[in-house]
Amino acid sequence: MEEFQVYLELNRSRRHDFLYPLIFREYIYALAHDHGLNKSMIFLENQGYVNKFSSLIVKRLIIRMDQQNHLIISANDSNQNPFFGHNNNLYSQMISAGFAVIVEIPFSLRLVSYSQGEEVAKSHNLQSIHSIFPFLEDKFSHLNYVLDVLIPHPIHLEILVQALRYWVKDASSLHLLRFSLYEYCNLKSFITPKKSISIFNPRLFFFLYNSHACEYESIFLFLRNQSSHLRSTSSGVFLERIYFYGKIEYLLEVFYNDFQNNLWLFKDPFIHFIRYQGKAILASKDTSLLMNKWKYYFVDLWQYHFYMWSQSGRVRINQLSKYSLDFLGYLSSVRLNPSVVRSQMLENSFIIDNAMKKLDTRIPIISLIGSLSKAKFCNTLGHPISKPTWADSSDSDIIDRFVRICRNLSHYHSGSSKKKSLYRIKYILRFSCVKTLARKHKNTVRAFLKRLGSEFLEEFFTETEEEHVFSLIFPRVFFTSRKLYRGRIWYLDIICINALVNHE
């Protein structure tokens, strides 16, 4: 039982006190301001708050909190404070931004301790999100079933606070967090109205959500690590199975040094778990019956241990050879490539049918066209239309915007097995650009192209920086044969790219 506690305690013995006084330090808000200026995190920050940041406002906020004069004012009060001359909601934004930096300090201290060689808890084989790409290339085609899991949100905000108190012992900080959450968010749901959540730092919400996810993932990983020892057995062979596991333990102890690479035969349960944003997948070589058991493990764990309402319909079982998995912006499946081999032996000949499993990643063209249609680049059928809101810009600015979006989409979907759908997206953006320019100059598309030619659209097809690097690495013959373009290329930064993030 002591061994199991290592998995379930989440290293909670390592708690840190006295985080609350940091809310009165000016450098905390300076760090929060630096987070806001980080362009890579632009989708996590409130730009209105960043633009209004100043050291004078920080000093006034600290004085106000130190005097305990109404730490937080209701979000419905949008009037300006006559004494300070600023919107009261601005102070709430700054407090939540500063608190988002403070609660991350215990985790930063753990990283410092690890770099100094101190002992840390087991990582349970947790890996970076970038390990998804080698998993798809090396392991995905060997699996049979996958659980497509839609992670439920906590139905009560107190669950988020309870998850954080295992890491932070400072009661004052937790009281401040609880008060802020209950003051500005809907008490019935984690999904709050935009008016309420806009004055609360999104970075803090993501941190609380990830802390809560880490809580139930630790229990799931414990079950995963023990799954290889929980095989169903009949009572008739139960004693033989005990001796069998005893032999396995003996083999693991004797051959650990000499045959370490072969230990996967005994230890690897062939279960892979990946979480990305609000979704997760559980892939395995098990049968559909065992995957159905894992499905109800998830539902029961969420409902009875974490008090989150979840239905079995939120967890779907897909057979990879028949269905595609919508994950990371791709439709991934396992395709069978049939091959016929003729074998000649003396006077007899044999024909052998082989089916090789191969990973197939396709672009969800329907949903992508829907996104382009919503952004007013085409209609619902995929026919390009002009972008009237951009017609007031200069020609070079219009072309740069379209080229940027086209390259971002090409960069993101470079891991696709088939590039035909990507060429269609490029076609839509190309002619949407032409129609926008023709609209600006009050001319038809045909007359506009006839007058200027298509040379000015060469930027859509010019060699990108990544392709230029590949042309230097790979031989020119291999590069010009276009095999490189047909192959999958995974770029590690696509996990934080919104496909149309730069179209506004």
From Swiss-Prot:
Single GO molecular function: RNA binding
GO cellular component term of the entry, any: chloroplast
GO biological process: mRNA processing; RNA splicing; tRNA processing
Pfam families, per the entry: Intron_maturas2 (PF01348), MatK_N (PF01824)
Main location: plastid
Keyword field: Chloroplast, mRNA processing, Plastid, RNA-binding, tRNA processing
InterPro entries: Domain_X, Maturase_MatK, Maturase_MatK_N
Record's subcellular location: Plastid, Chloroplast
Function, in words: Usually encoded in the trnK tRNA gene intron. Probably assists in splicing its own and other chloroplast group II introns.
HAMAP family, per the entry: MatK
Entry similarity comment: Belongs to the intron maturase 2 family. MatK subfamily.
Protein name, entry field: Maturase K
